[in-house]
Structure formats: structure tokens, C-alpha cells
Amino acid sequence: MANIKKGDLVQVITGRTQAKGGDRGKQGKVLSVLVERNRVVVEGVNFITKHVRVGQTQRGSKTGGIETVEAPIHISNVALVDPESKKPTRVGFRTEQVEKDGVSKTVRVRYAKKSGKDL
């Protein structure tokens, strides 16, 4: 089970400060997780300018120009945000017994280490 999943709220914990034009301290929602590259794409963080060539799409319209998109950031540079205190926290796992239709099942649950709340 992964520590960070799509849709989680994370905070950038390394890099240049916002005063110097960096992204450290910014919070955003995880748009996608690239497991094989150990990277995540975070909404509103790590923008790059991408030059797109003018070409035809399936609908026949021509698009192109310069656009800004979020680039992946290494998973070790972000921390999950505690839903209670809105501050970065570590992720823990605990096993719980869940009974469904008379069958007992063991399930791993993610929780915030600072507050102990389930994620």
C-alpha cells in the first residue's frame, strides 16, 4: 500500500522558499502518482513551460504555442498534510478487523502520525 495516493493533500517540504521563487511550503492535491519513477504530480506546484508545435487534432482545429504544465516532483520532497491540523505529517499503517457478511477480514488502514486520524 502506498503512502501517498491520487487525491491526497500534500505539502512540498524541500527546495527553494516561496520568497525566492520556489515551491517549498506550497500545498496541493496529488493529480497522479508515477510509481515506477517514484514521482508525483501536484496541482499548482513545479510549473514548467512547454512549447507545443502547431498541428492538427482529430477535430481539425490547430493548437500550439507556449503552455505551462505541472511537472513531476520526487515523492521524497513532499509530505502528506494532516487533515486535522493542516500541517505536514508522516503516514502510518495499522491493521483493523472488518466484518462483512459474517466474514472477518484484516485490512490495512493509513493514518496520520501526528493526530492519529484515518486518511
Curated annotation (Swiss-Prot):
Do you know which Gene3D superfamilies this protein is assigned to? 2.30.30.30
CDD domains for this protein: KOW_RPL26
- What terms describe the molecular function in GO for this protein? rRNA binding; structural constituent of ribosome
Question: Record's InterPro entries?
Answer: Rib_uL2_dom2, Ribosomal_uL24, Ribosomal_uL24_KOW, Translation_prot_SH3-like_sf
The UniProt keywords, alphabetically, are:
Ribonucleoprotein, Ribosomal protein, RNA-binding, rRNA-binding
Q: How does it assemble?
A: Part of the 50S ribosomal subunit.
- What does this chain do? One of two assembly initiator proteins, it binds directly to the 5'-end of the 23S rRNA, where it nucleates assembly of the 50S subunit. One of the proteins that surrounds the polypeptide exit tunnel on the outside of the subunit.
* The protein's name in its UniProt record: Large ribosomal subunit protein uL24
Q: What organism is the protein native to?
A: Clavibacter michiganensis subsp. michiganensis (strain NCPPB 382)
Source species taxonomy: Bacteria, Bacillati, Actinomycetota, Actinomycetes, Micrococcales
Name the gene. Answer: rplX
